């Protein structure tokens, strides 16, 4: 991230104010303030990640993934023989914090800030699947979109989706 000295000074002052306004996160803000003031290039890349963007198409895909899991769980709940499919298989895991942090951040934003999909269980890891999931979800979406009744899936259709 390239910043002029004036921009760095302004951002440093913002972090200083945030330290006072949000004591619970003061240590984090002091760290970021030091990085900005001293211009540590490697650590400044963290700011690129924090100020990155997700394209509208990506956001819509993530919502579609979450909606698919909602449909999977509703359909599973309506099955007469739920024992044939483990409930954990139709539970949304989230994304990998190490390699899919922006996707994970968007999921957390949708659930915790926007109040959508609040019935999803964040588990002890807060939707951190701890393994890359994007490609798996893409395969699952392809199968789900081909189903004629996406919210009234049969056991066979559920299995096809989760095994994609």
Swiss-Prot record:
GO BP term, example: DNA damage response
Induction behaviour: Only a leaderless mRNA has been detected in vivo, the first nucleotide is the beginning of the start codon.
Annotated InterPro entries: UPF0304_YfbU, YfbU_alpha-helical_sf, YfbU_helix-hairpin_sf
Coiled coil: none
GO molecular function: identical protein binding
A Pfam match: YfbU
GO CC terms, sorted: cytosol
SUPFAM superfamilies, per database record: YfbU-like
NCBIfam families listed in its UniProt record: PRK05445.1 (NF003936)
Record family assignment: Belongs to the UPF0304 family.
HAMAP family: UPF0304
Protein name (database record): UPF0304 protein YfbU
Provenance organism: Escherichia coli (strain K12)
Lineage: Bacteria, Pseudomonadati, Pseudomonadota, Gammaproteobacteria, Enterobacterales
Gene: yfbU
């Amino acid at each position: 991230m390239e910043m002029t000295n004036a921009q760095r000074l302004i951002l440093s002052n913002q972090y200083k104010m945030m330290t006072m306004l949000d004591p619970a996160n003061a240590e984090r803000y002091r760290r970021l303030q030091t990085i900005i003031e001293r211009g540590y290039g490697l650590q400044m890349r963290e700011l690129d990640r924090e100020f990155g963007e997700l394209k509208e198409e990506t956001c819509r895909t993530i919502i579609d993934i979450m909606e698919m899991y909602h449909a999977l769980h509703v359909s599973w709940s309506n099955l007469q023989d739920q024992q044939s499919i483990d409930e954990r298989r139709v539970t949304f895991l989230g994304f990998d914090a190490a390699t899919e942090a922006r996707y994970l951040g968007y999921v957390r934003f949708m659930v915790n800030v926007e109040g959508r999909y609040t019935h999803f269980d964040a588990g002890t890891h807060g939707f951190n699947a701890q393994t890359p999931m994007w490609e798996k979800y893409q395969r699952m979406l392809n199968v789900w979109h081909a189903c004629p009744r996406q919210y009234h899936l049969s056991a066979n259709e559920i299995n096809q989706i989760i095994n994609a």
